[in-house]
Design a protein with these regions (language model features):
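Conserved Radical SAM active-site core
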Residues: 2-5, 11-12, 17-168
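A glycine-rich, aromatic-flanked flexible loop/lid motif
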Residues: 139, 171-179
Length: 179
């Protein structure tokens, strides 16, 4: 389920979108995937205005409501990929989802340096992404994650990224999929 923020009205898309997906269960679908960016209301005034019209202060409040609605109306199991989350966010969303995820992409801080692919993107910092992954683990949330190949990383950095994910999983036992 794509939750667009700028090009279409969130109210119409949210509620009509749910009706559109009602036939998914009959087609054999079991899960509804919600994927979106990191708190777009902080970056785009249009997103904040749309949320406000709907009576929500944050994207995560809206996501929580939509995940619950999809589950109640269709029986599809919500899997949430909403970007960076803190422990409080995970606690709130855990009540309306069967699993969550975020791509680690890379554990290399080098990719954050000027001239590299994650420069100027604080949400891509390995430490904050690993923090979300570990917070989910502490709460026993089934989790999916992954690495990004082809972004300028070295073979060694790919291996280190996989090892960082293994370390988190060995500690908490929550990662069920690495893509």
């Amino acid at each position: 389920i794509h939750m667009p923020w700028i090009l279409c009205n969130m109210h119409a898309r949210g509620y009509a979108g749910c009706n559109m997906h009602a036939g998914c269960k009959e087609a054999g679908c079991k899960e509804a995937l919600f994927t979106l960016g990191d708190k777009p209301e902080l970056r785009y005034s249009t997103a904040q205005k749309e949320l406000s019209k709907l009576g929500f202060q944050t994207t995560l409040e809206y996501l929580r409501a939509m995940a619950l609605m999809v589950f109640e109306e269709t029986g599809l199991l919500p899997h949430l990929n909403p970007g960076l989350l803190d422990a409080k966010d995970i606690t709130s969303l855990r009540e309306v989802s069967v699993s969550m995820g975020i791509m680690l992409e890379s554990s290399s801080d080098r990719l954050m340096e000027k001239g590299n692919c994650h420069h100027g993107s604080p949400d891509k910092a390995p430490s904050v992404r690993l923090s979300t992954i570990d917070d989910a683990g502490r709460q026993k949330v089934p989790f999916t994650t992954g690495i990004l190949i082809g972004s300028g990383e070295t073979r060694r950095e790919r291996i280190e990224t996989l090892l960082a994910l293994r370390k988190s999983h060995e500690k908490y036992g929550h990662i069920f999929s690495i893509i």
